[in-house]
């Protein structure tokens, strides 16, 4: 059976890891063992934070909507309840964008929500 020399394969594998570790600090960028650990950990962080990003943006949208509706005398929860009663099917991303960039349009939405709410539910604490 012929002898298999694996130098090219191993070198290619090492170079792929070192290319992924480009820009890292210290021995993490040029020592294969440490670079492999750093690249693996970076992948774990990337996977985790792709999930966290969705939660973070939703929280940001809620904060922006809450700030905008409190200026109009409502709370976030009452506003969302009023949206449902008014039959407006807008998600938080769109509402936050309207609140930040299109205040006139958001004001019209708030007026519709206030008219759809029962009388006792209009007061912000």
UniProtKB/Swiss-Prot annotation:
Gene3D superfamilies: 6.10.160.10, Ribosomal protein L20. The keyword Ribonucleoprotein applies. It comes from the Bacteria. GO terms for biological process: ribosomal large subunit assembly; translation. NCBIfam families: rplT_bact. This is Large ribosomal subunit protein bL20. GO terms for cellular component: ribonucleoprotein complex; ribosome. Keywords: Ribonucleoprotein, Ribosomal protein, RNA-binding, rRNA-binding. InterPro entries: Ribosomal_bL20, RIBOSOMAL_L20_CS, Ribosomal_protein_bL20_C. Binds directly to 23S ribosomal RNA and is necessary for the in vitro assembly process of the 50S ribosomal subunit. It is not involved in the protein synthesizing functions of that subunit. One of its GO terms (molecular function) is rRNA binding. Belongs to the bacterial ribosomal protein bL20 family.
């Amino acid at each position: 059976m012929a002898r298999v020399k694996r130098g090219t394969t191993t070198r290619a594998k090492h170079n792929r890891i070192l290319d992924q570790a480009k820009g890292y600090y210290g021995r993490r960028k040029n020592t294969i063992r440490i670079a492999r650990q750093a690249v693996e950990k970076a992948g774990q962080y990337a996977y985790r934070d792709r999930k966290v990003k969705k939660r973070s943006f939703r929280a940001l949208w809620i904060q922006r909507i809450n700030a905008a509706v409190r200026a109009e005398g409502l709370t976030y929860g009452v506003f969302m309840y009023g949206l449902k009663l008014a039959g407006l099917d807008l998600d938080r991303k769109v509402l936050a964008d309207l609140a930040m960039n299109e205040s006139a349009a958001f004001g019209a939405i708030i007026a519709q929500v206030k008219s759809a709410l029962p009388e006792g539910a209009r007061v912000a604490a």
